[in-house]
């Protein structure tokens, strides 16, 4: 009976939470301290199939704060994605700037290899000098292949070494279906990725504030210093066509079709739309816009729990210096839910009747399951909020023996 009453009190107290926060359910290999943790995508999409007809080869709609996929189509099918490949090149550049390995005002001398790139370019000449700032802008706004290679060379010494790092970073982000061969997305045997993997690296790129200082630019120009000026026009038409769109990377080749990884924000919710293999440039923008419309119209972020929130009543402690210990939520949680479905969220505690002393602050003592429509969608760990020492002769003897100097030599 005592446990039942305690469980009811816990559920009532947890429903009083209102602070908005984000849970980190991801793991990654060691990274520089400024590198954001990868977004951990949910294993199952909220919808079994897209809610509208999508005239493209693959698609995915993601809410990156929760990591929740709203819907997907052929998300794990390997494909060429053309210049959407540059998402990884941009990401590595942003991370290098954050880590202090390069600065925006660093001057780069353009190599023959960079100047000789085909496809979309900003028309750099061999021996020309440009700043990292100009090259990054040219890649984000104009999808310039020559700028991408120039940055790859300044970051890693050569495009080949940059590609090695691209593949390494892809593995760290959990991009199991991806292999890079170049840093531009120009056609190359063996180069492929998936809509799910594009979502992973795009979420990482979109997490950098510096990215948005370039992504919103519609028209600009590059001064080459010899009298030539190259006009830049943003390849992502959605920044002009869709309310809330503030970033994205396009790409197209005969093999890849027309692709885009775009993001839009309305209120406190950001969405990422991945469209691969659309039949035309206009249709990829239309499809992404439809996907955004559905997500913003039907879903919202709901703050469920905040790390450090005390669970009322605490837990009894047997053999302790005090009779109970305060316990608290040990993670934050925000869920993506259908608008109006808040009442369907239930919190179910999984806590022991009591704890045995000693108890240290931070010790995990149980969890609280988050249940939506009868399904457990997340589990929030619960930890001790304070230390409780043990009392009694057996414990005292163990402490004395543990501190006794070793005998012998």
Q: Predicted segment positions?
A:
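Hydrophobic alpha-helical membrane context
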Residues: 15-16, 98, 291
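Active-site-adjacent loops and short helices of periplasmic peptidoglycan-processing enzymes
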Residues: 22-196, 200-209
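Surface-exposed charge patches
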Residues: 12, 168, 262
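Bacterial Sec-dependent signal peptides at the C-terminal "C-region" and cleavage site
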Residues: 17-23, 383
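General helical structural elements
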Residues: 6-8, 253
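Domain-terminus/edge residues, biased toward the C-terminal soluble/receptor-binding domains
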Residues: 175-179, 187-409
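Bacterial N-terminal signal peptides
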Residues: 8-16
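Positively charged n-region of N-terminal signal peptides that target proteins for export
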Residues: 1-4
